[in-house]
Structure formats: structure tokens, C-alpha cells
């Protein structure tokens, strides 16, 4: 339970925040309270939804100071899993300062897991290739690709499915995961009211709750593959 989970994608609208929300909930279902580090200062919905439920920190990874503060936060919370919700524009910060984090993983006694959320567009893959150049996979860093079911079934991700990038990820020990789609009316209410999954069960009508339970169970199974 000493891992850092980066919910990444380097572009807006791929589903990073929903993935982070599901990952936090999956830890809570296991009786483990993670630390949330929110780096999306333009749209900190995950932070605002969870700030009263789990430990939270809000940082900007556009500058060196944010990376320094993140390492210090990780040092203070050893033994606690960490969920990092990344901002859409963080590729420049990763390229410049990512080694600040990566170089300290050994001393922190932590490993890093990147969950890279993709849609069906080419730039998702191009940004992933750039990320792998800046933060290569290795013994201390696993990279998994998450096909977001909101954009269609796994078979529709043709660019990724037939890519050398997929082969590169899987040869390095990474997985290709299929994150379930949540009905729009349920997802929209969660986003609008900034609800946690547990909070949504208290606020939503029965039909919404039934759909949320279905999605939550599927998400838990998918994320369980990387929560070791």
C-alpha cells in the first residue's frame, strides 16, 4: 500500500477525474484511506468532492515548487497509498521536473503506477509516447493504459489496439484496462454536485443508485488488477 497512482492523460475530457474518484472509492471499500493529491487547479472537482472524506493536498505541477511539495507530502505519509489527479496540461511540467519525483522513489520506499486514460483520438497516444520518454516504465514505475468505455467498446479503440505503443506498454509489464461507462445522468449529477461515490448513494434516487452500483462494481474489478 505504498504506491503512488497517477491518473493521467495530459488532455481534458478523457475521464481522469472519474477514474481518480473510482480509485479512491476502491481503496475505501478495502478499508484503506488514501491521500489525494489534486494538481488540476483550474478544475479541482476531485479535491472539492473528497476534501471532507480523505486526506487531500492541492498542488500545481507546472513549476518546480509543486514537485518539491509533492515529494515532501509523500515523505510525510509513508505507508499510505496516494492518488494523484493530474491536470490536462501537465506534459511540460512532467518533462521538466518529473525526475524530481522519480529520483526519490527509492528513498521514499515507494513505486509509481501511471493509469493513462485514453479516448479514441491519435493525440492520446502521441501524448503517451511523450510521457514514456519523460517517465520511462521500469522496476519502480508501471504504466497501464485505460480505455474509457465512455468513448465506446474496446474494439473501437482501433488506433491504440493496433499500435506499437500498446505492444511497448505490455512488453514492459503494463496492462490494457477497460474502464466502464457510467450513464450520463448519473455522471452529470455527480459532477454538478461534486459528489463522492458514497455521497451519491445518499443523494440519488433508486434508479440512479442501481446504475451507480453496477458501474462501481465493474470499476472495482478493473482497478483491482493494479491495486496490489
Say what each PLM segment does:
Residues 1-3, 110-111:
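A short, charged/proline- and glycine-enriched loop
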Residues 2-6, 20, 29-97:
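Nucleotide-state-sensitive switch-loop elements of NTP-binding domains
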Residues 12-13:
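Walker A (P-loop) phosphate-binding loop of P-loop NTPases
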Residues 16:
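Conserved lysine of the Walker
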Residues 28, 75-76, 106, 136:
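Residue-level signal for alpha-helix termini/capping positions
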Residues 89-181, 185-187:
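Conserved catalytic-core segment of NTP-binding enzymes
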Residues 189-228:
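NTP-binding/hydrolysis catalytic cores, primarily Walker-type P-loop NTPases
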